[in-house]
């Protein structure tokens, strides 16, 4: 079994994500593969900036948020060619974005952004991109890392 980890640049553009697909599918011909992906390039920073805008009571958080939604939608529209898979993925991704919008709105309303809340916000980057990649790659299945990673301390760098 091989674990392949791809950073944000590897999932940052249509060209790079299609290259990732080729690499994974080639490796999977000879052995089982686990794929770990970062958020789309630049999304982690945008998630944090949007959280800080919401914390400051700046309505601009909504524009930043919509830009993230648009970026993910464009990626999906471009790389997922099967209509049914694309529709299912849009439903999944849009559900996640609705959760994220609610979190941002809560931060905006109460002017509080705990470390735990920021960690939850940032986690959406990887969760969104991993759903996209799992849909793109032939015979792939998506697993939610939260189901099997145990965190002993609740800090931004404490996953074990």
Locate predicted features.
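Nucleotide/pyrophosphate-binding catalytic subdomain
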Residues: 1-156
């Amino acid at each position: 079994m091989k674990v392949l980890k791809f950073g944000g640049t590897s999932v940052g553009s249509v060209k790079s994500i299609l290259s990732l697909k080729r690499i994974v599918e080639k490796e999977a011909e000879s052995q089982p593969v686990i794929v770990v992906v970062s958020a789309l390039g630049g999304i982690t920073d945008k998630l944090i900036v949007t959280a800080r805008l919401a914390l400051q009571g700046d309505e601009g958080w909504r524009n930043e948020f919509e830009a993230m939604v648009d970026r993910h939608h464009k990626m999906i529209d471009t790389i997922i060619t099967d209509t049914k898979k694309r529709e299912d993925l849009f439903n999944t991704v849009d559900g996640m974005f609705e959760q994220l919008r609610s979190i941002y709105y809560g931060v905006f309303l109460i002017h509080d952004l705990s470390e735990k809340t920021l960690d939850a916000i940032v986690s959406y980057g990887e969760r969104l991109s991993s759903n996209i990649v799992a849909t793109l790659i032939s015979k792939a299945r998506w697993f939610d890392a939260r189901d099997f990673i145990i965190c002993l301390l609740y800090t931004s760098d404490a996953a074990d």
